Amino acid sequence: MAVPKRKTSPSKRGMRRSADALKAPTYVEDKNSGELRRPHHIDLKTGMYRGRQVLTPKESA
């Protein structure tokens, strides 16, 4: 069975655990519609991605 050679210091343990925290998702304001969207994702209202029309927008009922 693997056994650590040295005791892990509280600093090292904390640095390892710092990546476990949940981070709030980031949003950017869309230049065309002004709505918030995730970066590197398609704007579902307009169907635009990086200045190109990639989806046909749904008709609002």
From Swiss-Prot:
InterPro entries: Ribosomal_bL32, Ribosomal_bL32_bact, Ribosomal_zn-bd. Residues 1-61 are annotated as: Disordered. Keywords: Ribonucleoprotein, Ribosomal protein. Pfam families: Ribosomal_L32p. GO terms for molecular function: structural constituent of ribosome. One of its GO terms (cellular component) is large ribosomal subunit. Residues 1-16 have a biased composition (Basic residues). GO terms for biological process: translation. Residues 28-44 have a biased composition (Basic and acidic residues). Belongs to the bacterial ribosomal protein bL32 family. This is Large ribosomal subunit protein bL32.
